[in-house]
C-alpha cells in the first residue's frame, strides 16, 4: 500500500492537469503559429506561469486498489500483485493462467 500523501498528491496533479490542459494546448498552438518573436515570447511566458504539476508527464500510473506505481498493467489498471490475486479468484473475465 502506498503512502496516503503520495496518492493525495497524485489526485491533486490529476485535477490540475484537467483544469489547465485546455489553456496549455491553446498557448502551445498559438506559440507555434506565431510569426513575430516578441509575441511568441509573451505567449510562452504565459505558458511558463502555469503550474508545473499541471503537466501530463508528471502523472504516474497507479494501481486502483493499492496505489502502487511499480509493476503496473495498463490494460487492467492494477499492479502485478493485485492482478495475480484477482485472476486466481476469477474476478477478471478472460484471464487464464498460462500452461504449456
Curated annotation (Swiss-Prot):
It is found in: Plastid, Chloroplast. It comes from the Eukaryota. Gene3D superfamilies: 1.10.287.1480. The keyword Chloroplast applies. GO terms for molecular function: rRNA binding; structural constituent of ribosome. Part of the 30S ribosomal subunit. Binds 16S rRNA, required for the assembly of 30S particles. NCBIfam families: PRK08881.1. This is Small ribosomal subunit protein uS14c.
